[in-house]
Amino acid sequence: MLMTFTRIQNLPTNCRAHLYSSARENLLRFLESKGFKPHPLEVFCPSPTHNWVDVAAVKGADLWAFEYKSRSDSIRRGLEQCVSYSSAFDYVVIVADRHRVTASPYFSKFKREGFGVWRHIGCGFQSIIPPKRRRSTPAARAVVERQFRRFGLTPGGDDRSILDWVQVG
């Protein structure tokens, strides 16, 4: 049986979108299994550049941003995105194939900046470098928190609606 391999860049756009969608779904399921409450959509981050976070999640009182990099994505761009997200999130993680990230000349910069690096292995994920807590700005954080509240998710673990606090009737 003859097997041919195609570079991801050579795949049609709809195939690349499917690969990204499937990797994103794997990450969402993995995060849920680890106690995170991921936002179902990409999240807007108020930044002059790189405004859309691939996966954002709440764990306890902390906001987490995850930037997924496929084999055809630029690791340098991933570093720029992580820098942009750090104004609004407590923890920022790049998720990619281990070799691509660790062999990249930018690997030491991720480490120095305190960004986490996770390896994507099949349907699972493994932490290579744990992220350090960031100091988010209140205004940027508020923009992200509003997006979570629309889906009933709030940092701090209190997922109740205001209606739970008010007696009706």
Model regions: which residues?
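Short amphipathic alpha-helical segments, especially helix-boundary/capping motifs
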Residues: 1-5, 57-59, 78-81
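Residue-level "edge-of-site" marker
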Residues: 44, 98, 123
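A generic structural signal for ordered secondary structure
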Residues: 57-65, 91-93, 118
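Short beta-strand-loop-alpha-helix junction that forms the active-site gateway
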Residues: 62-63, 67-76
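Catalytic cores of nucleic-acid endonucleases
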Residues: 72-120
